[in-house]
């Protein structure tokens, strides 16, 4: 775990324009790290995404709601566009950052749909995310 990458994810979270459902704005930023370098950044947004629509079936989802792009979906889309099939996803680390309005850390663990996407479609092995208690590393088994 590298706290420096969380700083970049924090900056990405400031670009989020996700207004959320139920009047609950949530700003999450993400960076993808490959071979110790940041190769992409993303954030959640009100824009819709077909990839998000595909994976929303893995969590409770109201079909009347739009499939707004989560930071994890956005970063995977960017990586796929940038690298095509040449990227070894098992060596990509995803850092996620979220904070409350007062600047304290908030939970940024991916939802069920994004966890499924990261593990099953892309083969990501490690994610790092914020919690109110600090930073967490989560590893996925084969």
Model-derived segments and spans:
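Zinc-dependent deaminase catalytic domain
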Residues: 1-142
């Amino acid at each position: 775990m590298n706290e420096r990458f969380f700083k970049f994810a924090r900056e990405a979270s400031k670009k989020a324009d996700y207004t959320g459902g139920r009047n609950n704005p949530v700003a999450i930023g993400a960076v993808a790290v490959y071979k110790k370098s940041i190769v992409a950044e993303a954030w959640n947004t009100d824009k819709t995404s077909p990839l998000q629509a595909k994976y929303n079936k893995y969590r409770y989802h109201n079909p009347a709601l739009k499939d707004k792009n989560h930071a994890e979906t956005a970063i995977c889309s960017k990586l796929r566009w940038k690298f095509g099939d040449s990227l070894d996803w098992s060596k990509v680390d995803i850092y996620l950052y979220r904070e409350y309005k007062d600047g304290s850390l908030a939970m940024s663990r991916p939802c069920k749909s994004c966890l499924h996407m990261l593990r099953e479609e892309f083969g990501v092995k490690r994610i790092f995310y914020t919690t109110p208690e600090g930073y967490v590393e989560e590893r996925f088994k084969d």
